[in-house]
A protein has these predicted regions:
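Conserved catalytic cysteine-centered active-site region
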Residues: 39-47, 74-129
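Phosphate/pyrophosphate-binding loops at sites that engage ATP/ADP/AMP, CoA/4′-phosphopantetheine
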Residues: 52-68
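Acidic, glycine-rich active-site loops and adjacent beta-strand->loop/helix elements
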Residues: 13, 73-78, 105-108, 133-138, ...
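Condensing-enzyme catalytic core mediating Claisen C-C bond formation in acyl metabolism
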Residues: 2-43, 145-219
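Flexible, glycine-rich active-site loops centered on histidine and acidic residues
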Residues: 122-156
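Short acidic, glycine/serine/threonine-rich loops at helix termini
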Residues: 27-28, 81-83, 141-144
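Beta-strand segments within the central parallel beta-sheet cores of soluble alpha/beta enzyme folds
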Residues: 18, 65-73, 99-104, 126-134, ...
Length: 219
């Protein structure tokens, strides 16, 4: 707008070297909406992640030996321990000492990972970073909660970011947290709030995805 200074200076010089995606073969139809959903015991979260990573490496004409850090940025991991990145590392980088870590802020995990890792690339800590988001959220959805059950697809996407000597990259990033909505989108069970040993038919909804969509929109 007139009189306002527009921020255009590149702060973090990173570029996309390659990317890849993987969607489950199975689809589910909700009226005119198509969702990709895994079939339980046929495709896993790790399968999707591995396929997306291999596609990204091929797209970039690189191998895992060219990657300095592997980041898993998924809303929900494979299991509490170890981190999902370690399990993905076992699939795609076994025998290599590439550091692997999770960056998790649920639905905004990829954005958080890119923001964080772009700083480390700019600082010279890493030259090339692979970020993968892999989701099979359908396995934890409550079929009785229509607003969430019909909303999500499963799938994976992987991007390889690398340092750049060109004037392009991240201009700015901004994140905010409104914790008054912390309990409007949650899976309560599985860790220390509701431990796995507490699972029963009566408590099973605590181990499913629960979303108060309209309330979130009004935050």
């Amino acid at each position: 707008m007139k009189g306002q200074k527009i921020m255009t200076e590149v702060k973090r010089h990173v570029e996309i070297a390659g990317y890849g995606v993987c969607l489950p073969k199975n689809t589910v139809q909700f009226k005119d909406q198509t969702r990709h959903r895994v079939v339980e015991n046929e495709e896993t979260q790790l399968d999707l992640a591995e396929a997306a990573i291999q596609a990204a490496l091929e797209n970039a004409n690189l191998s895992m030996k060219d990657i300095d850090c592997l980041v898993s940025a998924s809303a929900v991991g494979v299991q509490p321990i170890p981190c999902t990145a370690a399990l993905i590392h076992e699939r795609v980088a076994k025998g290599l000492s590439i550091p692997a870590m999770d960056i998790n802020t649920t639905c905004t995990s990829f954005i958080s990972a890119l923001s964080t890792m772009s700083h480390l690339i700019e600082a010279g800590e890493y030259r090339r970073v692979l970020i993968v988001s892999s989701e099979v959220g359908s396995l934890g959805l409550n079929s009785k909660q229509k607003e969430s059950y019909e909303l999500f697809s499963d799938g994976a996407a992987a991007f390889i970011f690398q340092s750049s000597d060109k004037d392009k990259g991240v201009i700015a990033s901004l994140q905010r947290t409104w914790s008054e909505g912390a309990h409007d989108t949650e899976i309560r069970g599985g860790l220390t709030a509701y431990q796995p040993k507490e699972y029963s038919e009566e408590t099973k909804t605590n181990f499913m995805f629960d979303m108060k969509g309209k309330k979130i929109l009004l935050l």
